[in-house]
C-alpha cells in the first residue's frame, strides 16, 4: 500500500517549467532515493510533498500521520549546545515525541559506535561544530522521532565517509522499524547501494530505476557516475 503518491505533478517558477508530469509512489517501509544535479529540482520536489510550495497541476496523496523533513539549510543558534537544539526539535511535537532517553536507547540499539559519536557531538556548542557534525546530528535526531514518513534532503552532504556510513545505517534501521524514507543525494553509489529503488530528476522529468545496473544499462555507461552524467544531460 502506498503511503505517498504523486500523480502527473507539474511545477513552474512564474513561466519557467521546473517539473512536468512527475509521478512517484512510496510504499510503507520503503526507502526511495532521488538523484539529480544542482538546480534539477530535488529540494522543490520535497517542498511540494511537504506543502511548502504548491504544484501548478497534478495531485499529491499523502497518508502519513507524522512526517519530518530535513532541509538543506540548517541554522541552529551558535551558543546552544547540540543537545539543546535536539530538545528544541523534539519539543516541536511534544505530545507524541519520544523522550530523550528513549531516543538514545533506540540509537544504541542501532549502533553502539553511532551512539557514542552522537553523544560526543551533543555536548558541543553549535559554534564549535563542523557543518558535517551539525548536519549528521540533525539527521539522526529526526530519524529517532518515530515518524512514518521521513524526507531527507542530502543528509550526507558535507559529512565525512565514516559518518556517511553510520547515517545510512541509521536510515536503514528506521526503515526496518517501519518508516518510509525519501532521501536525495549527489552520491550515486550510496543511493544505488542503499535504496530499494531510486529516481533521477533531470530535464523536468522523474525517471525510475530499480537498481544501479539498470541506470548503467539504460544509458550504456560503464560506471554509475557516467550514467548519472548521461542521465543529467539526456533530453527527450
Predicted regions, residues:
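Catalytic Walker B motif of ABC-type/P-loop ATPase nucleotide-binding domains
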Residues: 150-154
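The feature captures the beta-strand-to-loop junction immediately N-terminal to the Walker
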Residues: 35-37
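Helix N-cap at the start of a conserved alpha-helix in ABC-type nucleotide-binding domains
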Residues: 161-163
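ABC ATPase nucleotide-binding domain signature region
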Residues: 50-91
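A short, surface-exposed alpha-helical micro-motif characterized by mixed small hydrophobic
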Residues: 191-193
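H-loop/switch region of ABC-family ATPase nucleotide-binding domains
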Residues: 184-186
Amino acid at each position: 500500500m502506498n503511503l505517498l503518491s504523486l500523480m502527473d505533478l507539474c511545477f513552474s517558477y512564474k513561466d519557467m517549467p521546473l517539473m512536468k508530469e512527475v509521478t512517484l509512489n512510496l510504499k510503507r517501509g520503503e526507502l526511495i532515493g532521488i538523484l539529480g544535479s544542482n538546480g534539477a529540482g530535488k529540494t522543490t520536489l520535497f517542498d511540494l510533498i511537504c506543502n511548502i510550495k504548491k504544484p501548478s497541476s497534478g495531485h499529491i496523496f499523502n497518508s502519513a500521520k507524522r512526517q519530518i523533513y530535513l532541509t538543506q539549510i540548517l541554522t541552529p543558534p551558535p551558543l546552544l549546545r547540540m543537545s539543546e537544539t535536539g530538545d528544541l526539535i523534539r519539543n516541536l511535537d511534544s505530545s507524541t515525541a519520544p523522550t530523550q532517553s528513549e531516543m538514545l536507547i533506540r540509537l544504541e540499539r542501532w549502533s553502539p559506535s553511532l551512539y557514542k559519536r552522537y553523544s560526543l557531538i551533543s555536548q558541543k556548542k553549535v559554534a564549535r561544530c563542523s557543518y558535517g557534525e551539525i548536519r549528521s546530528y540533525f539527521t539522526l535526531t529526526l530519524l529517532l522521532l518515530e515518524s512514518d514518513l521521513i524526507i531527507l534532503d542530502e543528509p550526507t552532504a558535507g559529512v565525512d565517509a565514516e559518518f556517511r556510513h553510520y547515517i545510512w545505517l541509521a536510515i536503514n534501521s528506521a526503515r526496518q522499524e517501519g518508516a518510509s524514507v525519501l532521501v536525495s543525494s549527489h552520491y550515486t553509489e550510496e543511493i544505488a547501494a542503499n535504496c530499494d529503488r531510486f529516481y533521477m530528476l533531470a530535464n523536468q522529468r522523474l525517471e525510475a530505476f530499480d537498481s544501479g545496473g539498470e541506470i548503467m544499462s539504460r544509458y550504456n555507461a560503464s560506471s554509475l557516475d557516467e550514467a548519472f552524467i548521461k542521465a543529467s544531460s539526456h533530453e527527450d
